[in-house]
């Protein structure tokens, strides 16, 4: 039988386990993925193990030195090393020293440096060999399936833009149609890794989470390829130290300074002059093919960076900036049947559809609506709809038939961005090393209205467009302490922040600016966006619009905390770790407080009841006369204050059973309670609360009969305790077993067999919870 802990009980249990782990922190390891480990063996010429040999791992570039001693079987492990290029040397009394150079360690890697064969001789004599990079890339100390994109590949592999996530398409098991040509925060949700859902991945920069907790598909910040040392993607069979998400694990490591100064300056340019026009755009105007110009497609990227020592072997810095000036096509040809200049004022004399007067059932004389014949209320609607229709672009095509488009365009939006990155590394003393890294993004995009965008959607093109301000930053702070040569502690903190605000410019979307005052169910201020109009009928490609979500904003802050220790005991690397994340997400609802009208041609056609005549009437005429098919308006736009706490911990052992066989086994525990609203605004339909005796009655057309019952029958609320705080119960602490192995089939370290098994849990995207506040309670809960 499976039982779920209540939220309250799970909280208490989690707290007790946190205290236990803190007290027993002597056997824990780094749970994040910025560090790696180097394994190896030391033997003599006869193949016998050499115990108590001294192994020294150094990185002259960043002044790192680590010394370990071999165990009874001549093996050694050096954990918690920063990614980089190392020199590994082994020495013992009575033997020549052996030194292996160019040992490249990657993030989250368990690198086998191979066997160090010591020859009898004086300690002052040494043998130096260069590591085989190809051989070292074989993963023989873990069952994980992962792929590394090294710094060299980052430089050598051409991209369609500057999006580092575009490299994921090179990895086996990753499927995506991601277009990484533009620099944008969209992308992590565009990949399926080994069949997992696209929004179930974790993406970290130097161990700090970089995923928006609303859709789990966008990132807080971007970082350009020149600022990255390497990128690693774990696709399956990863160890218990990796969690938070059920899909792939993407780990990006930023560049750091070194004992030498390095830098670069770069410029990238792209122009639509090298592109062919859209074939459909060439054919859009039958009278003059090719008259619809190509969309502007221009990239001008300028960047620079510099890194070096503040004090050699002690402190280093890395600083870089990249400026993006982008004009990005909105996505193909946009064409529709826009109202002509005459139609906007009620003159349909040039329109190939007969317009009927709904009051008389007869055609209007000359196919013209005379506004002077309307009463005051009708005239008010006529004048306001006329103003709204005048906001659409005028025709620029000659339609080939009555039902063809008379307007076509290809638009681009402006998206200037700036990336800043600063990293500081500091060797405090022999036992403590610290680094801090800050990435800052500044962005303000301006979109034309005639585009599919987050909040300015549709085919009204107003001066100034729609503007999105999106500042964001991501920080990583990390301290590694060497307690003993085999016992290390690492603590890290990673806050990440993003803000977004959408809206028009200078009131261009507002009813006040445009002088529109159509009837509303609920009063609205002059700053409210213009009403949305949905036109239908005549088999015409009518334009549409949606501005009800303006102005819109969201603010997402996550804070990660990790405290981990590594303990190496003979041929075991025992690992236990702790991960905690706090998320805040403040977001205003989408909505239609501006009012949404739907209009068709029926009222002004020859058959207003059956609406069988598509060759008469027109939606524009029906709107001018105030014949709306439906109207919908929200009374308010609530703001959600969504929060969650997430705690995960694990125990794991990497056991080098034989020189050729490694076993990974461990258990991770995840406490992932649902997001909740801090104002207790969540409402859901709960079948347990439904009373059939008080249910509303429905007529033959499916409409609710007024005053026939309780409209809120079955609705539960987190505010009054009829629902759990997050809408549904927490599943408590969930176990996630992990098992993996790696076996070298041959002694030449050229063929490795790996396998593994594991379970993971994932937090559902926040939007599923947000809708319980933003929408009418149509969602169903099964507590």
What are these regions (language model features)?
Residues 2-150, 224-226:
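Periplasm-facing N-terminal accessory domains of Gram-negative outer-membrane beta-barrel systems
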Residues 95-256, 271-275, 281-292, 299-308, ...:
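Periplasmic N-terminal accessory/gating domains of Gram-negative outer-membrane beta-barrel systems
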Residues 131, 265-271, 319-323, 436-440, ...:
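Transmembrane beta-barrel strands of outer-membrane/channel proteins
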Residues 164, 177, 504, 510-513, ...:
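Solvent-exposed loop/turn elements at secondary-structure boundaries
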Residues 193, 252, 304-308, 422-426, ...:
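Residues on the lipid-exposed face of transmembrane beta-strands in outer-membrane beta-barrel proteins
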Residues 198, 228, 255-257, 299, ...:
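Outer-membrane beta-barrel channels and translocator barrels
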Residues 264-417, 442-462, 497:
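Periplasmic-side early beta-strands and strand-to-turn transitions of outer-membrane beta-barrels
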């Amino acid at each position: 039988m499976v039982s779920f802990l209540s939220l309250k009980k799970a909280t208490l249990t989690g707290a007790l386990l946190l205290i236990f782990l803190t007290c027993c922190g002597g056997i824990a390891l780094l749970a994040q993925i910025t560090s790696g480990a180097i394994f190896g063996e030391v033997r003599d010429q006869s193949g016998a193990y050499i115990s108590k040999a001294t192994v020294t791992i150094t990185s002259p570039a960043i002044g790192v030195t680590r010394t370990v001693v071999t165990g009874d079987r001549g093996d050694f492990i050096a954990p918690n090393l920063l990614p980089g290029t190392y020199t590994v040397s082994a020495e013992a009394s009575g033997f020549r020293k052996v030194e292996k150079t160019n040992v490249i360690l990657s993030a989250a890697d368990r690198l086998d440096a191979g066997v160090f064969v010591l020859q009898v001789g004086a300690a002052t004599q040494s043998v130096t060999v260069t590591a085989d990079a190809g051989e070292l890339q074989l993963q023989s100390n873990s069952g994980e399936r992962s792929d590394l994109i090294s710094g060299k590949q980052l430089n050598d592999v051409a991209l369609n833009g500057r999006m580092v996530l575009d490299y994921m398409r090179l990895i086996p098991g990753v499927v995506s149609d991601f277009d990484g040509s533009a620099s944008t925060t969209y992308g992590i949700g565009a990949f399926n890794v080994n069949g997992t859902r696209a929004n179930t991945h974790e993406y970290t920069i130097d161990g700090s989470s970089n995923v928006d907790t609303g859709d789990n598909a966008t990132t807080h910040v971007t970082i350009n390829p020149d600022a990255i040392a390497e990128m690693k993607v774990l696709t399956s069979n990863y160890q218990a130290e990796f969690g938070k998400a059920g899909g792939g694990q993407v780990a990006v490591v930023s560049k750091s300074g070194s004992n030498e100064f390095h830098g670069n300056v770069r410029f990238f340019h792209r122009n639509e002059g090298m592109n062919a026009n859209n074939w459909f755009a060439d054919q859009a105007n039958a009278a003059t093919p090719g008259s619809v110009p190509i969309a502007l497609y221009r990239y001008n990227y300028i960047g620079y960076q510099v890194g070096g020592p503040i004090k050699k072997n002690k402190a280093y810095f890395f600083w870089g900036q990249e400026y993006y000036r982008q004009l990005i096509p909105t996505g193909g040809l946009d064409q529709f049947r826009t109202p002509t200049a005459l139609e906007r004022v009620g003159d349909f004399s040039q329109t190939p559809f007969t317009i009927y007067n709904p009051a008389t059932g007869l055609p209007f004389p000359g196919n013209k609506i005379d506004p002077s014949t309307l009463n005051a209320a009708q005239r008010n609607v006529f004048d306001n709809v006329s103003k709204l229709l005048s906001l659409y672009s005028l025709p620029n095509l000659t339609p080939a038939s009555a039902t063809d488009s008379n307007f076509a365009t290809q638009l681009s939006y402006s998206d200037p961005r700036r990336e800043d990155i600063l990293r500081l590394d500091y060797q405090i003393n022999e036992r403590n090393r610290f680094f801090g890294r800050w990435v800052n993004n500044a962005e303000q995009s301006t979109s034309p209205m005639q585009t599919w965008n987050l909040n300015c959607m549709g085919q009204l093109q107003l001066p100034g467009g729609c503007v999105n301000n999106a500042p964001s930053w991501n920080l990583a702070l990390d301290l590694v302490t060497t307690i003993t040569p085999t016992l290390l502690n690492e603590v890290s903190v990673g806050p990440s922040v993003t803000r977004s605000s959408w809206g028009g410019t200078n009131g261009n979307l507002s009813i006040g600016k445009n002088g529109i005052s159509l009837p509303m169910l609920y009063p609205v201020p002059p700053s409210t966006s213009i009403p949305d109009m949905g036109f239908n009928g005549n088999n015409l490609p009518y334009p549409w619009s949606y501005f009800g979500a303006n102005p819109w904003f969201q603010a997402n802050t996550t804070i990660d905390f990790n405290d981990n220790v590594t303990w190496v005991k003979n041929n075991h690397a025992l690992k236990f770790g702790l991960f905690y994340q706090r998320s805040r997400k403040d977001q205003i609802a989408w909505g239609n407080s501006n009012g949404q009208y739907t209009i068709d041609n029926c009222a002004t056609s020859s058959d207003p009841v059956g609406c069988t005549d598509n060759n008469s009437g027109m939606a524009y005429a029906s709107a001018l006369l105030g014949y709306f098919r439906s109207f919908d308006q929200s009374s308010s736009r609530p703001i959600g204050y969504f929060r969650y706490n997430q705690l995960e911990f694990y125990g794991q052992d990497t056991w080098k059973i034989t020189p050729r066989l490694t076993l990974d086994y461990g258990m991770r525990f995840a406490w992932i309670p649902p997001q909740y609203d801090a104002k207790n605004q969540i409402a859901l339909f709960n079948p347990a609360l439904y009373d059939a005796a008080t249910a509303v009655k429905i007529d033959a057309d499916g409409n609710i009969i007024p005053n026939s019952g309780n409209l809120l029958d079955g609705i539960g609320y987190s505010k009054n305790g009829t629902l759990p705080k997050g809408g549904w119960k927490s599943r408590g602490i969930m176990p996630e077993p992990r098992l993996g192995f790696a076996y070298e089939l041959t002694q030449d370290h050229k063929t490795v067999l790996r396998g593994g098994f594991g379970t993971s849990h994932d937090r559902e995207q926040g939007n599923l919870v947000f809708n319980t506040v933003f929408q009418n309670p149509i969602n169903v809960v099964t507590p």
